[in-house]
Amino acid sequence: MLTIEMDNFDLGQICRSGQCFRMDQIGDDRYRVIAGDKYLELTQERGIVNFFCPEEDFIFFWIRYFDLDCDYSEYINMINPRDKYLTAAGEVGSGIRILQQDLWEMIISFLISQQNNITRIKKCIENISREFGVRKQAAQVQNIMRFRLQRHWLWQRKSSFGSVIWDTEQNMCWTQPEKSVSEIFHLTVCMI
């Protein structure tokens, strides 16, 4: 577990921002995220955030994903105080981060999102992943003191073009499909 103290980072605001469909609240101030082939659990109490993942994953993946190298207070301080609308937005959404997501994932999510709500988008992602994946077990951190392998299943199918991953606990994720982009687009439209 890595503990970081930071400003302008609110897990609840990020989860509700609609940027990704695989971040879920799983308890009081506890969240889980699947991005690409990575799984992360986080807790937050005020400005203290605990990342339950290997340090290597945090350094090489999650710092970039959550844009942690960027000081968002600089942006907020640049808002013209006479702009009441933007000032209010900066105050209300001060904990939102711009997630640095996989391009393929964003494109598919965007295609699915047209004329859909979040519940339906998650279901479509689940359907695509079930169609193109195979089961894979994922490791996750259960608490601060120990790391154990939980019965947390992902589906993954490898090909020269990439892989598709789906998690049975409603944490859908994938990197890239085995099918061509046009085949996936057609199947996505059919599943919507």
Task: Label each region the model flagged.
Residues 1-192:
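HhH-family (HhH-GPD) DNA N-glycosylase catalytic core used in base-excision repair
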